[in-house]
Structures are given as structure tokens and as C-alpha cells.
């Protein structure tokens, strides 16, 4: 007995278009590519923003302002709640231990501690930045906070 659940509905699978097989086939000669020009050639790919050879919009419009990307500091964010689960009382939280415990990936240059979650253990925190609320929570739990400069690492 056939399993009718495996049969695709009518019109779901369309037949492949066969081109370049004689002019009487309807798609012979130019194979549906039109006549000559860049689009008719193999490997044709006009880049994004190409306007047929005229000066593209992104080059006609003047540049304004500046980008601060090169100078932006990128921080890996770790919340106080995550420190609660991973660290034992009295342990030191620094770049090395955060990478070892898998809370931070090694490629991010700076680390910042934020205040989401609760902390009950006293821990020593030595990272680049700590938010004011996170610092309060760490100190209320009996820990200490030391913000280090990137050059010291």
C-alpha cells in the first residue's frame, strides 16, 4: 500500500527549464538571456550599487561627519549574577579567570561588570570597568573592586 503522505501536492515540484536546445524549443539561441551585454555573459555579476556605468549614488552624494569605530572601546559584559554561580568566596575575578571559566572570550580587549542578578559571596574583582550598582552589590557582599587600566594587563 502506498503512503500518500509522502506524495508532493500537484504543482509543488516544477520541471527544470531546459534552455539552448534549438530555436523551436522557445528558449534556444540566447537561452532567455536577451542579446549581448554584460548579463548575457557567463559569470556576470554586477556589484551592489552598480547603476549601469553612470556615477553611482554613493559616490555622487558627499561624505559627511566621521566614524569613531577605530577608537571605540569594546567591552565584554559580565553580570554580577553570573559571578555568583561560577566563583567561590574569596576568589579573584580577573581577565584570566573569566576566560578560564568561560564567561568571556579571549578576543575582547576590555571587560565590564554590570549589576544584573544578586551576589552573596565576597569576591575580589580586578577588571577594566565596573558599573556603580555592581560595585555596590560586590561591596555589600563583603568583596572588593579594583578597576585596572588596559596597559597593566
Curated annotation (Swiss-Prot):
Pfam families: Ribosomal_L27A (PF00828). InterPro entries: Ribosomal_uL15, Ribosomal_uL15/eL18, Ribosomal_uL15/eL18_sf, Ribosomal_uL15_bac-type, Ribosomal_uL15_CS. SUPFAM superfamilies: Ribosomal proteins L15p and L18e (SSF52080). The keyword Ribonucleoprotein applies. GO terms for molecular function: rRNA binding; structural constituent of ribosome. Transmembrane segments: none annotated. One of its GO terms (biological process) is translation. Residues 15-42 are annotated as: Disordered. Belongs to the universal ribosomal protein uL15 family. Binds to the 23S rRNA. PANTHER family: 50S RIBOSOMAL PROTEIN L15, LARGE RIBOSOMAL SUBUNIT PROTEIN UL15M. Part of the 50S ribosomal subunit. This is Large ribosomal subunit protein uL15. The lineage of its organism: Bacteria, Pseudomonadati, Spirochaetota, Spirochaetia, Spirochaetales.
Amino acid at each position: 500500500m502506498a503512503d500518500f503522505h509522502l506524495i508532493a501536492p500537484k504543482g509543488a515540484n516544477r520541471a527544470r527549464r531546459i534552455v539552448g536546445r534549438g530555436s523551436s524549443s522557445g528558449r534556444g539561441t540566447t537561452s532567455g538571456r536577451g542579446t549581448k551585454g554584460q548579463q548575457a555573459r557567463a559569470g556576470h555579476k554586477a556589484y551592489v550599487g552598480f547603476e549601469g556605468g553612470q556615477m553611482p549614488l554613493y559616490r555622487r552624494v558627499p561624505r559627511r561627519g566621521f566614524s569613531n569605530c577605530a577608537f571605540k572601546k569594546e567591552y565584554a559584559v559580565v553580570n554580577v549574577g553570573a559571578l555568583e554561580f561560577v566563583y567561590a568566596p574569596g576568589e579573584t575575578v580577573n581577565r584570566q579567570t573569566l576566560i578560564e571559566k568561560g564567561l568571556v572570550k579571549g578576543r575582547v580587549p576590555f571587560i565590564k561588570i554590570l549589576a544584573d542578578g544578586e551576589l552573596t559571596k565576597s569576591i575580589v574583582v580586578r577588571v577594566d570597568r565596573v558599573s556603580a550598582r555592581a560595585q555596590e552589590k560586590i561591596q555589600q557582599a563583603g568583596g572588593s573592586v579594583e578597576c585596572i587600566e588596559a596597559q597593566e594587563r
